[in-house]
Amino acid sequence: MNEAYHSIQTLLNKMDRQMKTVKEAIEEKDLQRAHRNLINLADNNEELMQEIRWVKKGTIL
């Protein structure tokens, strides 16, 4: 179970960095970069939701 929580925390940290990059790109009016990072953020959000579903079901990652 600790492995699952470590994986979730790692993903959350990655998403936090991506969100900071999105904010920076928007401030710099680099909308293409912001868009790419938002797509990656959405993909990671899907992965995070799946990992949380596995933890809730008791499936170990």
Curated annotation (Swiss-Prot):
Entry keywords, A to Z: Coiled coil
Coiled-coil residue windows: 7-57
Domain of life: Bacteria
Listed name of the protein: SPbeta prophage-derived uncharacterized protein YotK
Organism field: Bacillus subtilis (strain 168)
Source taxonomy: Bacteria, Bacillati, Bacillota, Bacilli, Bacillales
Gene: yotK
